[in-house]
Design a protein with these regions (language model features):
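Membrane-embedded segments
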Residues: 88, 96-102, 110-187
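Sequence/structural segment immediately N-terminal to covalent heme-attachment motifs in c-type
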Residues: 203-224, 236
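Extracytoplasmic entry segments of secretory-pathway proteins
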Residues: 1-118, 199, 296
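Gly/Gly-Pro-rich "capping" loops immediately C-terminal to redox-active cysteine motifs
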Residues: 157, 180-189, 223-258
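Axial heme c-ligation environment in periplasmic c-type cytochrome domains
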Residues: 176-179, 229-239, 260-294
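Inter-heme linker and motif-flanking segments adjacent to c-type heme-binding CXXCH motifs
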Residues: 174, 178, 203, 220, ...
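Conserved hydrophobic/aromatic "anchor" residues
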Residues: 164, 214, 290-291
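Short Fe-S-cluster ligation motifs
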Residues: 198-209, 248-262
Length: 296
């Protein structure tokens, strides 16, 4: 679908270049030519010719050409009935400044990553939990606004496996630029395996002080299957498999995880997670070690 959108763009670009060249050539011709004297009848005929050609024929041809390219492309992004395998539903909810991604058919929930199968249409149902966001993965197709209290649907389809970048394309606050979505298209078997491993995830809570801190603070907002049921912040059940933290702010490795826990406000100022200045570094380290185990 992204290829179709690109084709429309290139067609519009090519036509715009032609118009620019024609207008420039006419302007140069008008500047250089010698003025001629026309009778009233000749002047009227010339004006009529420009009105018909430039005011009627050219716009009509242009609009017909754009519609011929644009309507089929736009139709492909609508959630219309299809023959064969039915579209997969994926719900994406925008938050300041992270992505909640749900697979209602399997009950899988993740955050800041959008995994989809290759060669199968996907209906992306988007909405927002706070302000207006916009779902946009350039390599997959068009963009669609995420409006609080309203669900919009965009159909996308990946033609090959790979990793792509998604981005919120509607200004949504101070960290708008740091609202990145990791998108990965998997072959059908790999996608089915990905869903199955997430559906079966069950974790054990951390021990000692780390367990107490997680239960008293983290678990009130974050969900970890088998441990906590918080629903106000990103689901952490498969945190260790994600390439970044904070929706693209920092790499998800041992050092990045510790930096995020101890100083996340300097990394992504204004995010909703409170500071942990009163928690000893040793306890934060234990908590980070446990978070690194959250994977299938």
């Amino acid at each position: 679908m992204a290829r179709d959108v690109a084709n429309v763009w290139w067609a519009m670009f090519g036509f715009s270049v032609v118009v620019l060249l024609v207008v420039s050539a006419l302007w140069i011709y008008a500047m250089l030519r010698r003025p001629r004297t026309h009778t009233a009848e000749e002047a009227k005929r010339i004006n009529r010719r420009w009105i018909i050609g430039g005011g009627l024929i050219l716009p009509t041809v242009t609009i017909i050409a754009l519609l011929a390219f644009g309507i089929p492309t736009g139709r492909g992004m609508l959630p219309l009935p299809v023959e064969g395998e039915q579209p997969l539903r994926i719900q994406v909810i925008g938050h300041q400044w992270w992505w909640e991604v749900r697979y209602p058919e399997s009950g899988v929930v993740t955050a800041n990553q959008f995994i989809l199968p290759v060669d199968r249409p996907v209906d992306v149902e988007v909405t927002s939990a706070d302000v207006i966001h916009s779902f946009w993965v350039p390599r997959l197709g068009g963009k669609l606004d995420m409006v609080p209290g309203r669900t919009n649907t965009l159909r996308v389809q990946a033609s090959q496996s790979g990793i792509f970048r998604g981005q919120c394309s509607e200004f949504c606050g101070s960290q708008h630029a740091h609202m990145i979505l990791h998108v990965e298209a998997l072959e059908a078997d790999a996608f089915a395996s990905w869903i199955e491993t997430r559906r079966e995830l069950q974790h054990q809570p951390p021990s000692g002080d780390a367990g107490r801190v997680f239960a008293e603070r983290c678990g009130q907002c974050h969900r970890v299957t088998g441990v906590s049921e918080g629903n106000r912040a990103p689901d952490l059940s498969d945190l260790a498999t994600r390439p970044t933290l904070g929706a693209g702010v920092i790499a998800n490795d041992a050092d990045g995880l510790r930096r995020w826990l101890s100083d996340h406000q300097s990394l992504k100022h204004g995010n909703a997670m409170p500071r942990h200045d009163d928690i000893p570094e040793e306890t934060l380290g234990q908590l980070a070690d446990w978070l690194e185990t959250l994977a299938p």
